[in-house]
Design a protein with these regions (language model features):
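N-terminal targeting signals for export/organelle localization
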Residues: 1-46, 200
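Short loop/turn microsegments at loop-to-beta-strand junctions
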Residues: 44-45, 65-66, 165-167
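A short beta-strand-turn-helix
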Residues: 47-66, 93
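Short active-site neighborhood of thiol/selenol oxidoreductases, capturing the structured segment around
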Residues: 59-82, 86
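Structural microenvironment flanking redox-active thiols in thiol-disulfide oxidoreductases
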Residues: 83-141
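Thiol/disulfide oxidoreductase modules built on the thioredoxin-like
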Residues: 137-193
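C-terminal alpha-helix
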Residues: 193-200
Length: 200
């Protein structure tokens, strides 16, 4: 009986934690969307971070528009799904993809080394630029872009995951916000938006 009660308690705790993290993430996601729609303190800005080849990536040094996503290499679901979408966008753009910088910025700088990011992104598309930095550098960029992220311990394991905003941003070469794309937006619609900007 005691074992059964303990088992039920663990199941309940797991369900409660899952629901809490989902609702919390959904709340934060809606927050950035409301901020964009109200045009109040739009996300955006330049950044100077370490690229997956060990060099320095300065967003000011490029005249390309940016397709920007914040995630981490240990992410079990949303990051791989979004990076597959980004790879599809690049392929659909064809030669026009040369006019954009598809960028992945880690929100887990403690684990996401240059090597880890390079190997991880290699599974999706060679054109995706992976960036990392110190925690303070990542905090600064995340704040500028209105991206929340927080470590969450994994119950029963000496490990953690990272809850984070699941949105793709589109910005011009000045780092100014253009648009955002939540998960439900199909890649073909994002490609259309990018082409409209490129061909203006």
């Amino acid at each position: 009986m005691l074992k059964k009660n303990i088992f039920l308690f663990l199941i309940f705790s797991l369900v409660f934690a899952s629901v809490y993290f989902f609702l919390n993430k959904d709340y934060k996601q809606k927050g950035i969307i409301q901020r964009v729609e109200s045009q109040d303190n739009l996300p955006g800005g330049h950044f100077l971070l370490t690229s997956q080849d060990g060099g320095v990536f300065d967003s000011r040094s490029s005249d390309k528009i940016m397709l920007l996503y914040f995630g981490f290499t240990y992410c079990p679901d949303v990051c791989p799904t979004t990076l597959i979408k980004m790879a599809d966008i690049i392929d659909r753009l064809g030669k026009d993809s040369e006019k954009i910088n598809p960028i992945f910025i880690t929100v887990d700088p403690d684990r996401d080394t240059v090597k880890a990011i390079s190997e991880y992104l290699g599974a999706f598309h060679e054109d995706i630029i992976g960036l990392t930095g110190t925690k303070s550098e990542i905090d600064k960029v995340a704040k500028d872009w209105g991206v929340y992220y927080e470590k969450q311990p994994i119950k029963g394991a000496d490990d953690y995951t990272v809850n984070h905003l699941d949105i793709i941003f589109l910005a011009n070469s000045n780092g100014d916000f253009i648009d955002y794309f939540p998960p439900k937006i199909q890649s073909v619609l994002i490609v259309e938006k990018i082409r409209n900007i490129i061909n203006k």
